[in-house]
Structure formats: structure tokens, C-alpha cells
Amino acid sequence: SFSPNPINLIEDAHRVRPTSGLEFVSSRHFPDEVQGDILVHNTIGFLGTKQHSMTDGGTGYASSFRQDLLKGNDGNFRPVDMEFAPDGSLYLVDWHNVLVGHMQHSARDPLRDHVHGRIYRITYPSRPLVKPAPIVGASLTQLFENLKLPEYRTRYRTRRELRGLSTEEVLPALTRWVNGLDANASGYEHHLVGAMWGGW
């Protein structure tokens, strides 16, 4: 059977070319109303970061352009990656290169810069930074509790730490932690998913 093309989530006026930088807002350092927004970099044409709200849309999602979070006026500005830090601030990587791609320029072009770039830190001054959760060297109990935190990147880093520990140590403790969760508490299913991924 024929499957129709998926609905494009981004409005025509704000579409960007394929990009290597994409992040969902998941930080208590930023306002509540932007949690879950998607941030998308672009390095050709529009040089910057667009922000779109994301909402449930039936069996998928719907989005709406919120703002140009960042726009460069330097023709070499190449935002290529971003990630929320343990303190909730947003770090952005700018490749800052005169050349883009390898179709129109040789990979050996002397103008291709392999060593320079820029890193920006974006904060929301009227809100406090997030207290970083202990991860490296933290107890299993602390790591499991981190899985309840609202910051996706903290949960991600916690899962990576758990995966580096012995299965024989983690799984029995994780099972005890899951069995101790309150099935009627808010976020219960979310915590179960975190435990599943943390024990993988």
C-alpha cells in the first residue's frame, strides 16, 4: 500500500537545509513556556538557530515558529552543534569556516580551516542556573534519582554513566529502585522508561 509523504512540521517561511544541530529545550534555566521547543541550526542561507514550539498533533506533532533564537551577520558563521550543559545553559558550536561542503570546494582547499571555531554559551539571565546533578562517581541511588530530573541531557549523561558500570551491580539495584517507586505518583511511567533505558 502507498504511504503518503509525512507532513512537514516547519512552515515554508522557516524551513532550513539539513543541519547537524538540533536540540529540544529541556532545562529549568529557561522559561516554562519554551520547554519542549525544538532548536534547529542552519549553516547555508539563514545562518543561525530557529526556535519552534512543539505540540501534540493527533498521531504526530505540530510545530509553530517562535523566533530566530540566534542570527549571525558574519558570512562565515556556521552553527553546527548545541547541547544543554549540566547547569542548564545552552552551549553552541560555531564551525566558523569560509567554506561549506565539499561539492563546490576541494577537500584540500587551503581556505578550509580544520583547527578554529567558536563556542558560545547562552543563558537566561533572569532565571537561576540549574544545580548540576552528581554523575561521575555518584552512588547508584543518586544516579537512579537523576533519572527523575526534568533535564533530558542530565538523564542522558546519567544513563551513559550507568552503562559504564557493571551489569551485576546495576541491575539488582535498579530493580529495587523501580519496585520502590510509587505507581500513583506523577511521572511514574516516565521513571519506568528511564529505568529501562538506564539498565540497557
Residue spans of the language-model regions?
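Beta-propeller domains with acidic blade repeats across secreted/periplasmic ectodomains
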Residues: 1-145, 153-157, 161-165
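Buried hydrophobic core positions in alpha-solenoid tandem helical repeats
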Residues: 142-144, 173-178
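Alpha-solenoid helical repeat architecture
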Residues: 146-151, 178-187
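Residue-level detector of extended alpha-helical repeat arrays and alpha-solenoid scaffolds
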Residues: 154-155, 188-192
